[in-house]
Each structure stands twice: as C-alpha cells, then as structure tokens.
Amino acid sequence: MKNFIYIAVIGLLFISCKQKSETKQPEKEISIGEKIANAHGFENWKQVSEIQFTFNVDEDSSHFERSWIWKPKANEVIALSKKDTINYNRSVIDSILTKTDSGFINDKYWLLVPFQLVWDESITISEGIKEEAPISKTQLNRITITYPNEGGYTPGDAYDIYYDDDFLIKQWIFRKANQKEPSVITTFENYQDFNGIKIALDHKKAKGNWNLNFTNVKIN
C-alpha cells in the first residue's frame, strides 16, 4: 500500500511539473516584418484565390500600363495587353517568358510589398529606428531590407521602408544594388481595403507630376 501511495505521489509530481513546463513556454516573438504584413491584412491572404490589377505609371501626359491576373494557389499568371494575352505557370519559366515574368514580379512587388517582408525568406531586415522621412519630413519608423547578391531578377537591391506607429507603410526609398544614393523615393498613399487587405493605390515622388498607381484591383 505504501509503495502504491509513493508511486501515485511521484506520478502527480511528474504531471504537475510537466504542466508547469508547458505553461512557461514563451510565445514566439513577432518580427517587424510580420507586424507590417499583419497591419496590411496578411492574415486574410490565405483566403485569396485570385487577384487582378493594372500597374500604371503616369508622368505629365505620358502613360504606361500592364494588367495581370494572378492565381497564387495555382501559381498561374495571366499577362493582359492590347496586343495579346500570355498565360503561364511560374513553376515553369523559360527564356521566352523571363521578360514577362520579371515585369510581373516588379508590379506585384509594388502592390504587395508588405507581404514580401514575410514571403522573401532570403532578405535581411534591420532593426527599426525612428527618423525623418524623406518626403513628408515627419518622424516615422524605418527599416532597411536588403536582398542577397545572387538570385532573383534584381539581386543585391535595398529598400528603406518608412512606416507609422500602426505599422502602415508611408514612404520608401529604393536603392539599386544597395548603392548609397536613392534610385527612387515615393509615397504610399490612398490606401483602400480589398476583402481585408490594405493596398496603397498611389505612389508619388516629392516633385513633378509622377504617379505609379494601381487600378482595376480585385481580390477574390
């Protein structure tokens, strides 16, 4: 009987210790990249089966555009233009499709850069600091992301991303090949909500009548 009680006590102590060890496990810390992605509705991306958008660049009287339909779950892309329609799967890219796909990657990046902070596992993300933003001249948080020198269509590029205290992106600086001088500086403005996903439709420079913008955006 004493042996039974002894074994029972040991068993209870083991269960108690196990429960305490399980409850003491720290929660995974959310990275800055994840916080920015979440602020733009990243948790809703898993429900997306198709996204349509037109990428535009307007400067004074000149206009450039290209339209896309992307089915992320199937990894399918449809490039739409006045001349023709190109339908391809991103898992099979040959030399003929490289130019089309590089255009898609560029345009998608502008549209969904907050999510790229999670999707692009090879990037390096700096610690966030607060400093004066280049266009608004207001105090914003800033991180710098850099890409490896090999792989992708534009290896080695860097971006200085400025975001507010709600983790919404407000401006950015693109630095080609991680050079010191900026290649492009634009705003992120005119945010619209598409089924829980927040997208900045307009990106403007500090001077001049230049606007990289998105139209015909549909997310299903």
Label for each model-derived stretch:
Residues 90-157, 179:
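Flexible, processing/modification-adjacent segments and terminal tails
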Residues 18-20:
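Bacterial signal peptide processing site
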Residues 45, 70, 109-110, 172, ...:
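Tryptophan-centered motif/residue detector
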Residues 2-8:
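Sec-dependent signal peptide recognition
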Residues 139-220:
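Gly/Pro-enriched, hydrophobic low-complexity segments
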Residues 10, 46-48, 118:
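A generic structural signal for short, non-catalytic loop/turn and secondary-structure boundary residues
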Residues 13-16:
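C-terminal motif of bacterial Sec signal peptides marking the signal peptidase cleavage site
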Residues 24, 29-98, 123, 129-130, ...:
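N-terminal mature ectodomain segment of secretory-pathway/periplasmic proteins
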